[in-house]
Amino acid sequence: MSLLDELFPGIFNNEWEAIPKWENEDRPWELLSSRESGLISQISDYNEGEAFIHPEAIIGDFVRIEGPCYIGANAEVRHSAFLRKGSWICEGAVVGHSTEVKNSILLPGAKAPHFNYVGDSIIGIDANLGAGAKLSNVRNDRREVFVTLSDGERFGSGLRKFGALIGDNSQLGCNVVTNPGTIIAPGSMIAPNETMGGWVEVKS
């Protein structure tokens, strides 16, 4: 089983209207890189480098959108949200009030609804970030971000900017902070005010 399938099994449901394509399913974070097959390149294929906004998407007042980005059907981008270059907001996902998203994917039904920061990250299907949760994406020393897998293997990601992979149906409590390179297993329940790193699997 690939890491992509382990963390985001729901994406293999062919009913989704539009989700990114992964070249390396064992290193899903590579989609966040600037390579030709990367996220920004794929978004640009939809709308020549500008923002693609589905006619059924809901965009609130005072939202700032910087292309290229993709906003899918029935996605909701609420008042004063900030979508930076490389944001892919899949169908039914929510970007809430004063939330900032940068070079990241919210898979179908994912929610970053209140005062969140999502940097260089992938949030799984129906996963939810509690109010104030932050997915930090850069180490203080600006060096390469490392990842740890479920078997304890640790290695470099090849990226200096990489936030978190949040598995399908995971729930992060209010004010949770993830260190760069955090991987949260699907269905995990993270208590409020926690700082997380490495491989995380917390069941209720």
List the predicted regions and their residue ranges.
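Terminal amphipathic alpha-helical/low-complexity segments used for targeting or macromolecular assembly
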Residues: M1-E50, P55-E56, T182, P186-G187, ...
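Flexible, glycine/small-residue-enriched loop-and-beta-strand segment within the central core
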Residues: E36, I65-G72, E76-I166, L172, ...
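Short-chain dehydrogenase/reductase
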Residues: I58, E76, V177, M189-I190
